[in-house]
Regions:
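Juxtamembrane/disordered regions of integral membrane proteins
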Residues: 1-143
């Protein structure tokens, strides 16, 4: 379990952190800045973003085991199916609902930014759990 957390968590963090940069800055950066206007920062606070992603990956890594144990016993779900559902749920709750909807409500963020960003983070959550599941399968031994 220790290797799963350390190696799986580190690799997942690196992939997801960099994918977030590619999506939010390289692919959609101009669109986000146009839509967000005055509420967008000129320079990102990367240490805060990295800390948030470290916590995010750690939470997913810890709770994937619990969620999979339950889903396997109750619904006979595979690890892959569990990872997709669990990851999408965490992605939506973590950033889509809690972050995105509150930002829309408090920062004059356009609703379309909430929709695009929340959709991305829901998919990102599923990908995070899928990557973790590969390491879980290898180091913990799930079928």
């Amino acid at each position: 379990m220790k290797k799963y957390f350390l190696i799986g968590g580190l690799v997942t963090f690196v992939v997801i952190f960099n994918l977030g940069y590619v999506f939010h800055d390289l692919v959609m950066g101009d669109w986000f800045h146009d839509k967000e206007g005055d509420i967008a920062r000129e320079e990102l606070v990367l240490p805060a973003i990295a800390l948030a992603f470290l916590i995010y990956v750690a939470i997913q890594a810890y709770f994937l085991h619990i969620f999979h144990t339950f889903a396997k016993a109750q619904y006979a779900w595979s690890l892959t199916r569990t990872a997709l559902v669990f990851g999408a749920l965490i992605g939506f709750l973590w950033d889509g609902l809690q972050g995105g909807l509150i930002e829309y409500a408090t920062l004059k963020m356009p609703f379309e930014v909430f929709l695009v960003d929340s959709s991305y983070h829901t998919a990102e959550g599923a990908l995070t759990a899928l990557i973790l599941s590969l390491f879980y399968r290898r180091y913990v031994g799930a079928p």
